[in-house]
Regions:
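Acidic, low-complexity mobile loops and tails
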Residues: 1-7
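C-terminal catalytic/motor cores of large multi-domain enzyme assemblies
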Residues: 4, 13, 17-24, 36, ...
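Conserved donor sugar-nucleotide recognition element shared by glycan-biosynthetic enzymes
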Residues: 10
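Catalytic-site-adjacent helices and loops of nucleotide signaling machinery
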Residues: 30-31
């Protein structure tokens, strides 16, 4: 029997734990009766792999001089959240063949509508995040392109897991580091509900009062630089997801429509995807659909 068909005994919880680190659990020798794999076995396997990788780095170029040889320096501790995130980021970057598709969405009508929203009781302007509309638009596209809502759990046997749920990860910038909580079951929520949840999870992350489980079990992630600046970038996929959408600051641009120029509101899009399961043509079609969902017919598309 070939190695790839051997299945070691392990609980669903331990299998999930191994998958989160991108580890094939069948390569782990269990310490329990009949070779059953437990959590400590997975952790030991990770440690051994890291040690193995470092021992193979004989050709690594080392600094010939210390930084302090050239002037004053300061040593700082890496924040705990960043230390915890580091192996996940390295695993994503080294495991997934990333490709990034850059595009622009015309969201003029959507922004005009968002800025016109008022509370029916007080008459005050409603503060709805544009991200809430983007989350809703993304889910509409995920329904049409199910490969984007999947995970590759068994690449050796050619199997992918298609998810029937729609949990969108939102990258939150906090003083402690980047966190990615999930907005659950977005397909069943309206724009106002989503906007409120975005505020809620953001505060929970900043105050470190969020359950660890909320960082797992996502469909796809959105990362936004809108409040900071820039236009296009290359976001790293949040493993075990297969795609991530990066959005940047809105821009006002003169756009030619029917041979006339109009000032329009443009949203830069950066879509990174796993080239093992998604090809360039499918990514381009996905972006086109997303742009249409955010375009002038957004209210119809998103059931606003």
């Amino acid at each position: 029997m070939s190695d790839k068909k051997i299945k070691v005994p392990a609980s669903p919880k331990i299998r999930k734990f191994a998958r989160e680190f991108g580890i094939n659990i069948n390569k782990i020798v269990g310490s329990e009766r009949k070779g059953r794999v437990i959590e400590s076995d997975v952790k030991n396997f990770i440690t051994n792999q890291l040690n193995k990788d470092s021992s193979l780095n004989e050709n690594k170029i080392n600094n010939e001089f210390a930084h302090s040889d050239f002037g004053e320096i300061e040593l700082k501790d890496i924040p705990r959240i960043k230390k915890l995130a580091a192996p996940y980021l390295v695993n994503s970057w080294t495991t997934i063949p990333h490709v990034t598709n850059h595009d622009e969405a015309d969201i003029t009508e959507m922004e005009d509508f968002r800025n016109s929203l008022t509370d029916i009781y007080t008459g005050e302007k409603k503060k709805i995040s544009p991200l809430a509309f983007i989350v809703k638009a993304l889910v509409a596209s995920l329904k049409k392109f199910p490969n984007f809502n999947s995970s590759i759990d068994d690449i050796e046997n050619g199997k992918i897991t298609l998810k029937k749920y729609f949990h969108i990860g939102i990258a939150v910038d906090t003083p402690h580091g980047l966190m990615v909580p999930k907005i659950r079951n977005v397909n069943n929520k309206n724009i106002n509900h989503i906007s409120n949840e975005l505020k809620k999870v953001s505060e929970q992350c900043k105050n470190l009062k969020i359950n660890k489980k909320e960082f797992f079990g996502g469909s796809m992630t959105i990362t936004s630089l809108g409040g900071i600046g820039g236009s296009f970038f290359t976001p790293i996929i949040n493993y075990p997801e297969v795609a991530i959408l990066g959005i940047a600051r809105l821009e006002k641009k003169q756009i030619s429509i029917n041979n006339k120029f109009y000032l329009r509101t443009i949203l830069p899009l950066s879509l990174s995807y796993d080239h093992r399961i998604i090809d360039g043509a499918e990514a381009a079609r996905f972006n086109n659909d997303l742009k249409e969902n955010l375009g002038k017919n957004f209210a119809y598309k998103l059931a606003v």
